[in-house]
UniProtKB/Swiss-Prot annotation:
It comes from the Bacteria. Residues 79-179 form the Toprim domain. The keyword DNA damage applies. A zinc finger (C4-type) spans 56-71. This is Recombination protein RecR. PROSITE patterns: RECR, TOPRIM. GO terms for molecular function: DNA binding; zinc ion binding. It comes from Mycolicibacterium paratuberculosis (strain ATCC BAA-968 / K-10) (Mycobacterium paratuberculosis). GO terms for biological process: DNA recombination; DNA repair.
Length: 203
């Protein structure tokens, strides 16, 4: 254990996902070794993220405006919506360059053991979005692209149950080929692109 601010920094860094005690200590001592202007730039960026980044009012993706750049782009097909768990998954799908529709970010996946049920996700917003015809466009297809793990599959099954009786709506699931238990963000562009192109109807 270190004393004072150094230990406080290590403790805070250790709260970040994927950062264990040793990594937190290594990062902390790296930060202690850099020049003060570099620390100032880092803290300024963190402050801008805290104060300026919000979630898109339409899809839930991260944005610096009320609408994200994808929802604001008239070239995107508003009739096709790809449902993902987190904003990082939007970036994973975008890297494939295979999808030209829009997104809906749930903010997680169903996980009853962790207290995450339907009310903790943006499922109600998805249903409202389908019913309200955002930008005067009917949503005709919802692509479910939750992670291929237990929570992601449970979320996909729940969404199918909620969406299958909506007239004129096709519900599809990205094809198999992604490793079971993996995350979309770690899939390579070719594999994820093929999974999107080979999506299958669920209803």
């Amino acid at each position: 254990m270190f004393e004072g601010p150094v230990q406080d920094l290590i403790d805070e860094l250790g709260k970040l996902p994927g950062i264990g005690p040793k990594s937190a200590q290594r990062i902390a001592f790296h930060l202690l070794s850099v020049e003060p202007p570099d620390i100032d730039r880092l803290t300024a960026v963190l402050a801008r993220v805290r104060d300026g980044v919000r979630f898109c009012a339409v899809c839930g993706n991260v944005s610096d405006d009320e609408r994200c750049r994808i929802c604001s782009d008239p070239r995107r097909d508003a009739s096709v919506v790809c449902v993902v768990e987190e904003p990082k998954d939007v970036q994973a799908v975008e890297r494939t360059r295979e999808f030209r529709g829009r997104y809906h970010v749930l903010g997680g996946a169903l996980d009853p053991l962790s207290g995450v049920g339907p009310d903790q996700l943006r499922i109600r917003e998805l249903l409202s979005r389908i019913g309200e015809r955002v930008d005067d466009v009917d949503i005709t297809e919802v692509i479910i692209a939750t992670d291929p793990n237990t929570e992601g599959e449970a979320t996909a099954t729940y969404l199918v149950r909620m969406l299958r009786d909506i007239p004129g709506l096709t519900v599809t699931r990205i094809a198999s080929g992604l490793p079971m238990g993996g995350d979309l963000e770690f899939a390579d562009e070719l594999t994820l692109g093929r999974a999107l192109a080979g999506r299958r109807a669920m209803v």
